[in-house]
Regions:
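N-terminal anchoring/assembly modules that precede and organize ATP-driven motor systems
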Residues: 7, 13-78
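Generic structural hydrophobic/aromatic packing signal, biased to beta-strands
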Residues: 57-59, 65-67, 93, 97, ...
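A charged amphipathic helix-loop-strand protein-protein interaction module that recurs
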Residues: 81-109
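P-loop NTP-binding catalytic core
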Residues: 102-148
């Protein structure tokens, strides 16, 4: 395996495949572009080695943005005090991904995820909105995870 290649699990569980570093960085940058502006800026400051290795971007209300790397979870920010994600930013992220039409995405959102441009799967946690005992939507978003 060359220095610019990484072995990653196939997204559909079909073994492993080699992904070149440039592609992995591009996917990271595309995922980061889904974030509110201040988090996009922070993600651009992450070293390319970590960008290439990142598997997820994790945002939790009241905590800092973290990256899931092969070795574990690390803060995206390099210096303390780490900036904190707000619930409003999580709501903005979901609104942006759904083109401000969460109602149109209510089917998948009620199951806890969204699919963004580029095929990114976004896990969403919040308070279930029930109608006749059936989960129809989410509100009060508390965390979002973007799978790269």
């Amino acid at each position: 395996m060359g220095r610019d290649e990484h072995i990653v699990e196939h997204p559909r569980g079909k073994g492993v495949e080699r992904v070149d570093e440039a592609y992995a960085i591009r996917r990271y940058q595309q995922a980061a572009a889904l974030l509110p502006l201040r988090w996009q800026r922070l993600c651009r400051q992450v070293p390319e080695e970590q960008q290439a290795e990142a598997e997820e971007l994790r945002l939790r209300a009241g905590q800092t943005l973290t990256l899931l790397l092969r070795g574990g979870e690390v803060p995206a920010a390099r210096e303390r005090p780490y900036p904190v994600v707000t619930q409003t930013e999580l709501e903005q992220l979901c609104d942006g991904v759904t083109d401000y039409s969460r109602y149109a995405a209510a089917d998948t959102l009620s199951r806890g995820y969204l699919t963004a441009r580029g095929g990114f799967r976004i896990g969403v946690c919040g308070t279930a909105v029930l109608r006749d005992g059936v989960n129809t939507n989410l509100r009060d978003i508390s965390s979002v995870t973007i799978r790269i």
